[in-house]
């Protein structure tokens, strides 16, 4: 599958990352988490992160609220770090982009995105809505 081709070893069902128990701590599972969803899924990540682990948050697709307690931060020393893509200084962006293009570059990065022209965009949007596109679509205005 597409995800296996990217090196994925296991797909975690949403039920495992959306704890509705109300408990302030869960079984420590993760050393680190990159969250793009927010809400209770982010809280589940926080309360199931191992001692000294870190969570980054860069989105709020599910919710921008965080129904959390401070216990994971105090008892496990968990760190929550917000990723700001708006105010990030250009010199910092360039350093990170250079690393992504160099030493951090994925072997199969071409599989993550495809290009389309502006004229092809409506067709691509329809395909995305039908679930027929995997990865990202980049509009190349020069094409």
Cite the ranges covered by each PLM segment:
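Adenosine-nucleotide cofactor-binding segment
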Residues: 1-40
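Terminal peptide-recognition signature
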Residues: 3, 33, 45, 80, ...
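Short beta->alpha linker loops
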Residues: 15-16, 37, 61, 91, ...
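Short acidic active-site motifs
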Residues: 20-22, 40-44, 120-124
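Short SAM/SAH-binding signature in class I
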Residues: 30-34, 53-54, 136
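Glycine-rich phosphate-binding loop and adjacent beta-alpha segment
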Residues: 40-106
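C-terminal hydrophobic helical "lid"/dimerization subdomain
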Residues: 94-143
């Amino acid at each position: 599958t597409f995800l296996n081709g990217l090196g994925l070893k296991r797909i975690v069902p949403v039920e495992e990352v959306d704890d509705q128990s109300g408990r302030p701590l869960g079984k420590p599972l993760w050393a680190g988490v990159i969250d793009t969803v927010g809400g209770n899924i982010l809280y589940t990540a926080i309360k199931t992160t191992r001692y000294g682990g870190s969570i980054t948050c860069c989105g709020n697709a599910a919710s921008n609220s965080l129904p959390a307690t401070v216990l994971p931060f105090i008892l496990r020393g968990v760190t929550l770090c917000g990723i700001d893509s708006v105010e990030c200084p250009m010199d910092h962006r360039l350093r990170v982009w250079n690393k992504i293009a160099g030493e951090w570059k994925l072997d199969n990065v071409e599989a993550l995105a495809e290009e389309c022209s502006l004229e092809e965009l409506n067709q691509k949007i329809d395909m995305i809505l039908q679930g027929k596109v995997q990865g990202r679509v980049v509009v190349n205005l020069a094409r």
